Amino acid sequence: MTATSPFSPQEIAAEGIKPEEYAEIVRRLGRHPNKAELGMFGVMWSEHCCYKNSRPLLKQFPTTGPRILVGPGENAGVVDLGEGLQLAFKIESHNHPSAVEPFQGAATGVGGILRDIFTMGARPIALLNSLRFGSLEDPKTQRLFSGVVAGISHYGNCVGVPTVGGEVYFDPAYSGNPLVNVMALGLMETPEIVKSGAAGIGNPVLYVGSTTGRDGMGGASFASAELSDESIDDRPAVQVGDPFLEKSLIEACLEAFKTGAVVAAQDMGAAGITCSTSEMAAKGGVGIELDLDKIPVRETRMVPYEYLLSESQERMLFVAHQGREQELIDIFHRWGLQAVVAGTVIAEPIVRIFFQGAIAAEIPADALAENTPLYERELLAEPPEYARLAWEWSSEALPTGTTAGIEIQGNLHSWQDILLTLLNTPTIASKNWVYRQYDHQVQNNTVFLPGGADAAVVRLRPLEGQGSRGAGEQGGVNSLSGVAATVDCNPRYVYLDPYEGAKAVVAEAARNLSCVGAEPLAVTDNLNFGSPEKPIGYWQLSEACRGLAEGCRELATPVTGGNVSLYNETFDTQGNPQPIYPTPVVGMVGLIADLTKICGQGWQGVGDVIYLLGASITTLGASEYLATIHNTVAGRPPRVDFDLERRVQKVCREGIHAGSVRSAHDCAEGGLAVALAESCLAGNLGAEIHLEVSPTQLQRLDEVLFGEGGARILVSVVSTQQATWESYLQEHLGQNWQKLGIVGNTDTDLAVLTTDNQTLIRVSIEEMNDRYQNAIARRLAL
């Protein structure tokens, strides 16, 4: 191969390569790359593929544990559920594609994460999503929001995997740069977990699935750049998915894996053929030769650069045992899919690409996939000014209140009015407008409808092939067991204090699982941040990773893998970059041994006794109340007390397992008052609450009602077990619990009073329901 002429600085920059990185490429190759090779380095050395800014920080995460079977580095993490069952799970982002083409961007995000799951040999059983948008009053946000939800529902519904839960936040910080994070779970169906490292010199390399076109060109590099007003021109970088073809691909792959003829498998996601060949070769310590002329195409006159960087969807790369390739090809043809032998595993650790009989690219595999650039940036010596100023805020800056309410700018707002305002806030309000577009009951294993509990719960039914696993016959599998999953992040907490905020994310995820009776097992994380090249951006990323690592260690929930999405920024009208709130989303899974011992968040029976587990210490700093009612984003988020978190969560789980706790709900955004309202609405039952309020607290009733703090769970217990339950609480929580009141009838209100019977809130279920259920639809004028 002869050296080509140097590229112009503009051509190099267009591939997302920095000048010093290009010099390193030339040094490694001993020559200048050609156009195809330049493109290969551009995508593989992008942040999206190689994590060059975040990799040093990710090393802090705990990644091992007694149930961890596969940790970071593979397509998905895998945990042991016992009884011969193994769960694969992973979260991924599709933020930038969704910003320029919301429907396809979100749809292909679903398709991509599902491929990560079934590539391991697992059948997808559930999807969750974590979404962030700008203000819902903004017409642009309405378009993005509607498009993303439609894209998620289209792909998930068509492919036949239920979307069982998630979260949606709205904040101007995400205007123009929405976050679309999708988590998938799958139950292992193959005798062995399928890995991605190529092996066996001379083994054939198979291309299977859909055809290759020009869609998704440069998607990985696009996902590693900041968005601008011109990003709409990058629509060709957004892939187009076919969920019906993916449904066939799932079945064909699982059937193929069960033959034992597959050595390794890799999804063609970001960077397409380039990524799958280089990663499989590098992980196996071998090389791969691939002939582009063998690749099935959907467009004519494609050149190597286009083949190698295409991100056409629903494609996979297999390494097969020599002599068994036709067996696999026949399976894929029977499912109406493409399948061809396109290459070979070679001893030389090189990715060598042929096109029209000549070498089109030749690069050491580890230069693309392992030995990639690494940037260890200098951390700010002290927190940035915005954080220090925010931390100076205290509740003394707010007007004091009375039992009648609080006066804001000359107008008295009753606590009841404030509660209704918060229930009408899209971030807090019901997401039924979203959920009703998803098929959340396909596969017939969904235990709670979305919104009915603090975490999604899916029944674990024996799947085909599990009898061959160590547990013996399928009948040995406990069909009463289930898996719970949640996705969580309070981005305002993380913005105001990345370290404490990230710890709170892990704590809330575990708390949500505990509220349904699940034992938290492991984490997959999605780090959505701004530019790490800016000191504040890197400080936020570094501090959040430190907090996540500590939280996962404290709660014994190792990280099995995840995704990093940086450069999430938009430009204001003056052309200044504005980063999103730092948003480290935690996806956490938990095990439920007995599905008859679970509970949702709604009250269950008239006369049940209501308790608040945990400390009564709360803060208005970083709260939804402060942001919505006072239009102020300031203060410190609640500090996490991991010892109390562990005790409160364990008490909740054990209370559920013993049959004492009939409902459980985390006190999160909006504080105690919102949690009470949500439990009333979920159970369609009122409640009478009596709060012990000290003379000092009388002036800060907003903190009592709407203050936020960790380690707080609202539970209801059948009255006949009150004495036993309170004795149990005293033994395990000491003074860290309160009896609040009793559950009322369907026609009673939510009444919150002081212990001397002064009414703070009295509101009907009907009025709360109108605000809560219709908040999003009203803003969309639907």
From Swiss-Prot:
The biological process GO terms on file are:
'de novo' IMP biosynthetic process
UniProt pathway annotation? Purine metabolism; IMP biosynthesis via de novo pathway; 5-amino-1-(5-phospho-D-ribosyl)imidazole from N(2)-formyl-N(1)-(5-phospho-D-ribosyl)glycinamide: step 1/2
Binding positions for Mg(2+) 2?
A: D116, D267
Q: Where does ATP bind?
A: Y51, K90, D525, G562
UniProtKB keywords: ATP-binding, Cytoplasm, Ligase, Magnesium, Metal-binding, Nucleotide-binding, Purine biosynthesis
EC numbers listed for it are 6.3.5.3
Q: What class of enzyme is it?
A: ligase
Among InterPro entries, the record links this protein to:
PRibForGlyAmidine_synth_PurL, PurL_linker, PurM-like_C_dom, PurM-like_C_sf, PurM-like_N, PurM-like_N_sf
Where in the cell is the protein located? Cytoplasm
Residues at the active site: H48, H94 (proton acceptor)
- What Gene3D superfamilies is this protein classified in? PurM-like C-terminal domain, PurM-like, N-terminal domain
| Ligand binding (Mg(2+) 1) | E92, N563
Per the record, the coiled-coil ranges are none
NCBIfam families tied to this protein: FGAM_synth_II, PRK01213.1
State the similarity comment. Answer: Belongs to the FGAMS family.
Q: What does this protein do?
A: Part of the phosphoribosylformylglycinamidine synthase complex involved in the purines biosynthetic pathway. Catalyzes the ATP-dependent conversion of formylglycinamide ribonucleotide (FGAR) and glutamine to yield formylglycinamidine ribonucleotide (FGAM) and glutamate. The FGAM synthase complex is composed of three subunits. PurQ produces an ammonia molecule by converting glutamine to glutamate. PurL transfers the ammonia molecule to FGAR to form FGAM in an ATP-dependent manner.
Q: What protein am I looking at?
A: Phosphoribosylformylglycinamidine synthase subunit PurL
Species in which this protein is naturally found: Nostoc sp. (strain PCC 7120 / SAG 25.82 / UTEX 2576)
High-level lineage: Bacteria, Bacillati, Cyanobacteriota, Cyanophyceae, Nostocales
